[in-house]
Amino acid sequence: MAVPPTYADLGKSARDVFTKGYGFGLIKLDLKTKSENGLEFTSSGSANTETTKVTGSLETKYRWTEYGLTFTEKWNTDNTLGTEITVEDQLARGLKLTFDSSFSPNTGKKNAKIKTGYKREHINLGCDMDFDIAGPSIRGALVLGYEGWLAGYQMNFETAKSRVTQSNFAVGYKTDEFQLHTNVNDGTEFGGSIYQKVNKKLETAVNLAWTAGNSNTRFGIAAKYQIDPDACFSAKVNNSSLIGLGYTQTLKPGIKLTLSALLDGKNVNAGGHKLGLGLEFQA
């Protein structure tokens, strides 16, 4: 293991098996294009089949690789505008600096963040400062890795309250085909996940979570099967008897169709199930 993942990416492989390939209750359209000069456009729109609410977003990104710079502009249907400037591997190898700002003309709300990340062999360190009107908050994270073993700590300090408001700890083990992840959030929320790549076509995952003082344990299993290079099938179920099914088909290069359904196993004949449709275009 050269560089360990960020704290947010610990256990990501298992989460991807549970989340990717599903879009319950949504009709979604994604479009990604890239011009000859390297300018990337990403637009996304979705409609909620229950509330009929329509949301959308637009993002443009330009990479100035010669200087390690990335410029990103964002807009969404809540009329929030965002700007992000990133410089990587310029001031020091493995160091990434990001300035992220957003502004909502409707409400006048402004937000700014400075994000820093440093990664080298066996270590991944991050520190973000959020400049909020109520007072800046600082979020720090550290992940150490050695021979597949991972240990991470994440904290959030609010200057207005002069105290740590979040303290999370995680331990895991990672190989190319197997991943184990456990975490404790604020000493009250406990979770764990296992990811197993059975073979080139089949991936499986298990997750478990519970809260101190609550006897309700949340448990789920999921699997993803690559039928052929252009099609894959996903399925998951949890201890609430909710069954998720997903099918993704590449219709032609750059066009991908996703169909998904969420079924209530306790009330199969009662209705209330959710369906999802997604189309992704990439050029």
Curated annotation (Swiss-Prot):
The modification Phosphoserine is found at S13, S193, S240. ATP binds at K12, K20. The record marks E73 as: Involved in ceramide and phosphatidylcholine binding. Critical for channel structural stability and gating. Keywords: Acetylation, Apoptosis, ATP-binding, Cell membrane, Host-virus interaction, Ion transport, Isopeptide bond, Lipid transport, Lipid-binding, Membrane, Mitochondrion, Mitochondrion outer membrane, NAD, Nucleotide-binding, Phosphoprotein, Porin, Transmembrane, Transmembrane beta strand, Transport, Ubl conjugation. NAD(+) binds at L242, I243, G244, S260, A261, L262, L263, D264. Changing K53R: PRKN-dependent polybiquitination is decreased, whereas PRKN-dependent monoubiquitination, mitochondrial calcium uptake and apoptosis are unaffected. The modification N6-succinyllysine is found at K20. The modification N6-acetyllysine is found at K20, K109, K252, K266. The modification Phosphotyrosine is found at Y67. Inhibited by nitric oxide. GO terms for biological process: apoptotic process; behavioral fear response; calcium import into the mitochondrion; epithelial cell differentiation; learning; lipid transport; mitochondrial transmembrane transport; monoatomic anion transport. Expressed in erythrocytes (at protein level). Expressed in heart, liver and skeletal muscle. Gene3D superfamilies: Porin (2.40.160.10). Consists mainly of a membrane-spanning beta-barrel formed by 19 beta-strands. The helical N-terminus folds back into the pore opening and plays a role in voltage-gated channel activity. Non-selective voltage-gated ion channel that mediates the transport of anions and cations through the mitochondrion outer membrane and plasma membrane. The channel at the outer mitochondrial membrane allows diffusion of small hydrophilic molecules; in the plasma membrane it is involved in cell volume regulation and apoptosis. It adopts an open conformation at low or zero membrane potential and a closed conformation at potentials above 30-40 mV. The open state has a weak anion selectivity whereas the closed state is cation-selective. Catalyzes the scrambling of phospholipids across the outer mitochondrial membrane; the mechanism is unrelated to channel activity and is capable of translocating both anionic and zwitterionic phospholipids. Homodimer and homotrimer; in response to cyclic AMP or calcium; oligomerization is required for scramblase activity. Component of the mitochondrial permeability transition pore complex (mPTPC), at least composed of SPG7, VDAC1 and PPIF. Interacts with SPG7, NIPSNAP2 and SLC25A30. Interacts with hexokinases including HK1. The HK1-VDAC1 complex interacts with ATF2. Interacts with BCL2L1. Interacts with BAK1. Interacts with RTL10/BOP (via BH3 domain). Interacts with amyloid-beta and APP; induces VDAC1 dephosphorylation. Interacts with TMEM41B. Interacts with BCAP31. (Microbial infection) Interacts with influenza A virus PB1-F2 protein. This is Non-selective voltage-gated ion channel VDAC1.
